[in-house]
Swiss-Prot record:
Pfam families: Thiolase_C (PF02803), Thiolase_N (PF00108). Its EC number is 2.3.1.9. This is one of the enzymes that catalyzes the last step of the mitochondrial beta-oxidation pathway, an aerobic process breaking down fatty acids into acetyl-CoA. Using free coenzyme A/CoA, catalyzes the thiolytic cleavage of medium- to long-chain 3-oxoacyl-CoAs into acetyl-CoA and a fatty acyl-CoA shortened by two carbon atoms. The activity of the enzyme is reversible and it can also catalyze the condensation of two acetyl-CoA molecules into acetoacetyl-CoA. Thereby, it plays a major role in ketone body metabolism. Disulfide bonds: none annotated. It is found in: Mitochondrion. It comes from Danio rerio (Zebrafish). Keywords: Acyltransferase, Fatty acid metabolism, Lipid metabolism, Metal-binding, Mitochondrion, Potassium, Transferase, Transit peptide. The gene is acat1. Homotetramer. CDD domains: thiolase. Belongs to the thiolase-like superfamily. Thiolase family. Pathway: Lipid metabolism; fatty acid beta-oxidation. This is Acetyl-CoA acetyltransferase, mitochondrial. GO terms for biological process: fatty acid beta-oxidation.
Length: 420
């Protein structure tokens, strides 16, 4: 071979290797997996010290996780990891989600992580699981949330007082319902939002009555029953009591709603026990997987994860944080608010939903169409997962649903799904 021919051959080889190795680094980008929801269930929601109060959050979580896997129709061994939201963890024991998944019969080899983003914990669990599935770290996961507010303990300081009595603190209030920056109850933040947004007591009461009315109608029509798995409560020497229905929505007397005193502001206060959410017990869980895993397991997906986003504002303004998360998730999804057929904005307080409807300029008739936390209850680690699961069951084919939930500290999470 002549030197010229050898040079030509070497040049061709160099160009081939450059194309093979160098161009690959610059011309290709990894694609994310499509994530689908194949089941979504929840327990009934129990009233504070009510029907579910004897069961710890971890047991409620077990029931929801098992129910979701059973509905999906897949072997428990297929679940590679579990994320569950849980806020008030004191006294539950180590690794609450680990307890919940083992109680649901999952293998000892299944990893678990507990998520605490206050009221957004259940939704954030879904978001984090979706990220893991999108990136290919796992292919089948369970995500949701659980809370037993009835079993939250009181605490006292470890130091012995030099003189006088011992002060006990309620961890529901301290860890769940107090703005740590302003040193007051979340209800005071709601009052601040009502004032700044010019939302009256009458508007909040009307919204609460509507929430109770819608929840009652949804139960009577069977809409809510399809997302609920029964809970059996063991009894001493008697048959188990089976709880199949939410407890809170029946506990209302509409004639008393306008007569109740404001709870947080004595003068010109607007937030009452009726137009705020209640303390509750319950759990929700969803089975998520990649589209490839759904095909492999011969599972029919119900909906797909389109996009999700978080936002943060001043802690006192937490009630309006969803109004900042929603534009971000719409942009990420590449759609407009007019494309959303169903909105779920968590009813921590009636004023939360009213303020966000006003700020986002959305149709109130598409928001919380079957009631919400004011009437159904708000187990704080569960609610974010509950509202996502509710959309899964109630959207029609091809429709988009958007759920948003505020959280203490001045935050919110939001998610868009599309029904198959």
């Amino acid at each position: 071979m002549t030197s010229r021919a050898l040079y030509s051959t070497r040049s061709q080889l160099c160009r081939h290797l450059a194309h093979k190795y160098l161009s690959r680094s610059y011309s290709t980008r990894p694609s994310l997996n499509e994530v689908v929801i194949v089941s979504a269930v929840r327990t009934p929601i129990g009233s504070f010290k009510g029907s579910l109060s004897t069961l710890p959050a971890t047991k409620l979580g077990s029931i929801a996780i098992k129910g979701a896997i059973d509905k999906a129709g897949i072997p428990v061994e297929e679940v590679k990891e579990v994320y569950m939201g849980n806020v008030l963890q004191a006294g539950e024991g180590q690794a609450p989600t680990r307890q919940a998944l083992l109680g649901a019969g999952l293998p000892l080899s299944t990893p678990a992580t507990t998520i605490n983003k206050v009221c957004a914990s259940g939704m954030k669990s879904i978001m984090l699981a979706s990220q893991s599935l999108m990136c290919g770290h796992q292919d089948v996961m369970v995500a949701g949330g659980m809370e037993s507010m009835s079993q939250v303990p009181y605490i006292m300081a470890r130091e012995a007082p030099p003189y006088g009595g011992v002060k006990m603190e309620d961890l529901i209030v301290k860890d769940g319902l107090t703005d740590v920056y302003n040193k007051f109850h979340m209800g005071n933040c709601a009052e601040n939002t009502a004032k700044n947004s010019s939302i009256s007591r009458e508007e909040q009461d009307a919204f609460a009555i509507k929430s109770y009315t819608l929840s009652k109608a949804a139960w009577e029509s069977g809409i809510l029953a399809k997302e609920v798995v029964p809970v059996s409560i063991p009894q001493r020497g008697k048959p188990d009591v089976v709880v199949k229905e939410d407890e809170e929505y029946r506990k209302v007397d509409f004639s008393k709603v306008p007569k109740l005193k404001a709870v947080f502001l004595k003068e010109n206060g607007t937030v009452t026990a009726a137009n705020a959410s209640t303390l509750n017990d319950g759990a929700a869980a969803l089975v998520l997987m990649t589209a490839d895993a759904a095909q492999r397991l011969n599972v029919t997906p119900l909906a797909k994860i389109v996009a999700f986003a978080d936002a943060a504002v001043a802690p006192i303004d937490f009630p309006i944080a969803p109004a900042f998360a929603v534009p971000k998730v719409l942009k990420a999804a590449g759609i407009k608010k007019e494309d959303i057929a169903m909105w779920e904005i968590n009813e921590a307080f009636s004023v939360v939903v009213l303020a966000n409807i006003k700020m986002l300029d959305i149709d109130p008739d598409r928001v919380n169409i079957n009631g919400g936390a004011v009437s159904l209850g708000h187990p704080i680690g569960m609610s974010g997962a509950r509202i996502v699961g509710h959309m899964v069951h109630n959207l029609k084919s091809g429709q988009y649903g958007l759920a948003g939930i505020c959280n203490g500290g001045g935050g919110a999470s939001s998610i868009v799904i599309q029904k198959f």
